[in-house]
């Protein structure tokens, strides 16, 4: 037959992966030919075609450029008359990953079949040894540029022009597993040494093969050359040990027709010793390649995936898939921060089981869980001594027993938010003040039995407090305010909405140099002078809420605008102010971003226009039920100052509808009349 260069394309020459009569090359398709991963005679593996069809990347009388379709050709992702699109199964064809009667799923090998890189009579496998098969050549053959025969009719090959491929002192071997046909361009690649290509044409076309790009990772199969973690090609022998590693980065395409050629190229790196990449490989080396099941992933990786699920998704969906997933969903790391709020099915027994499975719970929220009793909370306190945050709003069935248990067994408690619990009294607060020295954040809104007695104990015992919020606690007076101002100098957030405090107690808050947020809503005996003094003394104040205080007037707001240099939020709903207050804010304040003057009956169009025009910092202006502000004026301001959000009934409705449309909501079509 004569000598054949590896990339020659004459009829009686043999190139790796080239197809001639009675020979089968990977990715080639002729009548009675079998492409890699294909099964019985007359069947077609993925990316292959049947009689009269051409598989992409195949060589023969009808070479096909990848992704291009012409007469008698098949583009990999296009199907026309007499053509086969990949992953499509027709008569006498096999869809990948599907096996039926007379069909073979990919990666399976049987009689008259060829596994990738395997050897059989009359077949060409690039890295296997058998009759009529191809082996790689050594550098000593480089001068001759031919294919020489070895014992038992074996053939060795190499590219006739390798002068540019290897340093003078190195031995070089190159096995090209994707080149076939009469005319072809060399694929792109990046190697761990000087640039390598397969012909002079390639050197002219692509002078620099090294490019950059994100690394790509795929799985590895024994005996196959695959793209491995880290952006390298690795050839694996039967023992699943890497024999050849070639650095690879995603490369720029050589041409549009060979865009993805680099991922089918196999080039061993330079080596001073005899390479071992293809030693002892045979058809028995390769077992069937099974797709990786998700449960074969390391448990640590599955836990990381499950951490992105919500509690409902883990408990209701993922845990029902299989026992393994259920066990993973019960891992203690998922039970540190529990939000069980508004779940009526949560009862004491469920709470006890959760606490028994994970004693690492640090946060728990049982708001609106009306079936949880003091007993369930006591079990949590006993079994979870590391509890840091406890939230229980509107659990009217709970009493002092719950908080006393938490105070006794959870010394690290830092946050306690308990609201609207009629049974809670000073007894629980006294125990917390004596035991919970790390307490930093407490909310006791609408707990009507709490008085100064319990709060003073907390103020004296929990001097690390940073936030305190009381709401409608009529038994809380100026004494509590004085105690917190004296014993808790680190307070940053203070709220006494609707409590029985007066200006006499509030003035003590000027001692809090770190105060940043102050909520004084609905304090009937609050005068303007007290508010102005607090703003002057507390230079770090960023939020001030004075809603529902009819005593606050324009003069007070003017001083706030001048002195509150750090102030960003000012709430004045239902205060006794006029347009002058808005004009003063726009004129004097360079920091205020949010102003709400809803239900202020004396605010008119003029005030709204002036603050929008003069203020450089304003971003939100609340005008809800300011009846003297014309909606047409607001619409004009919206168009003129798009960086400001104007809040009125109509504007809020428009924004709500707009968000609904963005989320895919459509109004019901009116019935035909």
Curated annotation (Swiss-Prot):
SMART domains: FBOX (SM00256), LRR_CC (SM00367). Disruption phenotype: Impaired nervous system development caused by inability to eliminate aberrant BTB domain-containing protein dimers. The keyword Transferase does not apply. GO terms for cellular component: cytoplasm; nucleus; SCF ubiquitin ligase complex. One of its GO terms (biological process) is protein quality control for misfolded or incompletely synthesized proteins. Keywords: Cytoplasm, Neurogenesis, Nucleus, Ubl conjugation pathway. It comes from the Eukaryota. Its main location: cytoplasm. Residues 9-39 have a biased composition (Basic and acidic residues). It is found in: Cytoplasm; Nucleus. Residues 291-338 form the F-box domain. InterPro entries: F-box-like_dom_sf, F-box_dom, F-box_LRR-repeat, Leu-rich_rpt, Leu-rich_rpt_Cys-con_subtyp, LRR_dom_sf. The keyword Nucleus applies. Expressed in the neuro-ectoderm of embryos. Pfam families: F-box-like (PF12937), LRR_6 (PF13516). Residues 1-39 are annotated as: Disordered. Belongs to the FBXL17 family. Part of the SCF (SKP1-CUL1-F-box) E3 ubiquitin-protein ligase complex SCF(FBXL17). Interacts with BTB domain-containing proteins; specifically recognizes and binds a conserved degron of non-consecutive residues present at the interface of BTB dimers of aberrant composition. Substrate-recognition component of the SCF(FBXL17) E3 ubiquitin ligase complex, a key component of a quality control pathway required to ensure functional dimerization of BTB domain-containing proteins (dimerization quality control, DQC). FBXL17 specifically recognizes and binds a conserved degron of non-consecutive residues present at the interface of BTB dimers of aberrant composition: aberrant BTB dimer are then ubiquitinated by the SCF(FBXL17) complex and degraded by the proteasome. This is F-box/LRR-repeat protein 17. The lineage of its organism: Eukaryota, Metazoa, Chordata, Craniata, Vertebrata. The gene is fbxl17.
């Amino acid at each position: 037959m004569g000598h054949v260069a590896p990339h020659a394309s004459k009829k009686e020459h043999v190139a790796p992966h080239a197809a001639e009569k009675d020979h089968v090359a990977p990715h080639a398709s002729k009548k009675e030919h079998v492409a890699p991963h294909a099964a019985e005679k007359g069947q077609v593996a993925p990316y292959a075609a049947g009689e009269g069809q051409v598989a992409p990347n195949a060589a023969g009388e009808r070479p096909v450029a990848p992704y291009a379709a012409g007469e008698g050709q098949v583009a990999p992702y296009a199907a026309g008359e007499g053509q086969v699109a990949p992953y499509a199964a027709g008569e006498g064809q096999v869809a990948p990953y599907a096996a039926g009667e007379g069909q073979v799923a990919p990666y399976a090998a049987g009689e008259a079949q060829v596994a990738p890189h395997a050897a059989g009579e009359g077949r060409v496998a690039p890295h296997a040894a058998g009759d009529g098969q191809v082996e790689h050549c050594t550098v000593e053959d480089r001068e001759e540029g031919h294919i020489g025969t070895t014992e038992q009719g074996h053939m060795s090959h190499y590219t006739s022009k390798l002068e540019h491929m290897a340093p003078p002192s190195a031995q070089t071997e190159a096995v090209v597993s994707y080149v076939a046909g009469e005319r072809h361009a060399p694929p792109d690649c990046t190697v761990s040494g000087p640039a390598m290509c397969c012909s002079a044409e390639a050197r002219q076309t692509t002078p620099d093969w090294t490019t950059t790009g994100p690394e790509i990772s795929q799985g590895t199969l024994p005996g196959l050359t695959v793209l491995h973690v880290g952006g390298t090609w690795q050839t694996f022998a039967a023992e699943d040990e890497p024999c050849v590693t070639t650095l690879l980065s995603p490369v720029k395409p050589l041409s549009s027709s060979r865009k993805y050629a680099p991922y089918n190229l196999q080039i061993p790196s330079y080596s001073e010793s005899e390479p071992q990449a293809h030693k002892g490989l045979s058809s028995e080396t390769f077992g069937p390649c099974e797709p990786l099941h998700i449960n074969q992933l390391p448990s640590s990786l599955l836990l990381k995936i499950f951490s992105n699920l919500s509690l409902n998704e883990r408990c209701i969906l993922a845990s029902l898939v299989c026992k393994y997933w259920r066990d993973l969903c019960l891992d203690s790391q998922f039970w540190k921060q529990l939000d069980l709020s508004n779940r009526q099915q949560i009862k004491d027994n469920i709470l006890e089981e959760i606490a028994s499975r994970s004693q690492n719970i640090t946060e728990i929220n049982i708001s609106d869980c009306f079936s949880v009793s003091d007993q369930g909370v006591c079990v949590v306190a006993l079994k979870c001594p590391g509890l840091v945050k406890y939230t229980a709003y509107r659990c009217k069935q709970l009493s002092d027993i719950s908080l006393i248990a938490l105070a006794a067994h959870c010394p690290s408690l830092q946050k306690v938010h308990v609201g609207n619990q009629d049974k809670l009294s000073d007894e629980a607060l006294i125990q917390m003040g004596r035991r919970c020295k790390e307490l930093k954040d407490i909310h006791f809104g609408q707990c009507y039995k709490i008085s100064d007695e319990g709060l003073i104990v907390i103020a004296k015992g929990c001097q690390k407090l940073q936030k305190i919020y009381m709401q409608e606690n009529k038994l809380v007076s100026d004494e509590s305010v004085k105690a917190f101002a004296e014993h808790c100098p680190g307070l940053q957030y203070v709220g006494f909405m609707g409590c029985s405090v007066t200006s006499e107690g509030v003035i003590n808050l000027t001692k809090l140099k770190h105060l940043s947020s102050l909520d004084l809503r609905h304090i009937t005996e609050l005068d303007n002078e007290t508010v102005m003094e607090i703003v002057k003394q507390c230079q770090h104040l960023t939020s001030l809420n004075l809603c529902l205080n009819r005593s606050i007037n324009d003069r007070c707001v003017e001083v706030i605008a001048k002195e509150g240099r750090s102030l960003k939020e000012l709430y004045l709903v239902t205060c006794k102010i006029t347009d002058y207050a808005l004009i003063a804010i726009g004129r004097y304040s360079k920091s205020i971003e949010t102003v709400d003057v809803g239900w202020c009956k004396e605010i008119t169009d003029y005030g709204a226009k002036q603050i929008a025009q003069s203020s450089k910092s304003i971003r939100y202006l609340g005008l809800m039920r300011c009846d003297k502000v014309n909606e047409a004026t607001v619409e004009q301001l919206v168009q003129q100052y798009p960086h400001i959000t104007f809040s009125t009934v109509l504007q809020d409705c428009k924004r709500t509808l707009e968000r609904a449309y963005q989320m895919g909501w459509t109004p019901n079509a009116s019935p035909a009349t």
